[in-house]
């Protein structure tokens, strides 16, 4: 163990005393995550990390609390297991109701990214390489809203932002590249809810669909200021089910009473 030595001079007595103090906490300088997605492609959007930390267990942000990561890259030091769904203990961060997380990069070595147990707020949170999901709302009341402002995600085989609770998920000024679905309302949870998505200022590249919603449960997705390149569908509707053994069935795509946007809301780059 390293120690800092403090020398206290007692000139009147002609003596010196040595006191051992524990070292300050250290954050390992991160290997470069900048400009790297999980598939090896490059992007100028992922910010440089200020360090890295592999957590031995999920870091919980208490109800109403906040955590500012200072752009450190956090993960769990484990390999991604693909689309095999993990649980809360596999997440990097778990945010209790009313909590907030800001200025964090979720590194590539994890199974689950961030779990939200009630309305929460994410500001400038980035995912270097998505595993099963980048972010999941596990619980939320019908009248509540979770807010994601800024940040981005890269290299998602399927979903980026998953909504399993009720109420609204609002996402603004978010970048996503190489993905399956940016947002998805759970299609076959044991308990199904009406869910709403508000997407504004999204820049999306190389993906299947921006939003997947269940119109038979009253879901809606509203889009404004969207810029896309290589994205197949803006909004896809499904017939959801509360039978976890069944898969939801796609039943439509494009503007509708459920998928709310016009051609002026979407710009192709």
Language-model regions, residue ranges each:
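Beta-strand-rich luminal/extracellular ectodomains of secretory-pathway glycoproteins
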Residues: 27-36
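Extracellular beta-rich repeat passengers
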Residues: 35-59, 66, 71-86, 114-269
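Short stretches within intrinsically disordered, low-complexity N-terminal or propeptide regions
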Residues: 12-14, 32, 223
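LRR N-terminal entry segment and analogous cap-like coil->beta motifs
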Residues: 64-78, 87-91, 95-112
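Fungal secretory targeting signals
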Residues: 1-23, 28
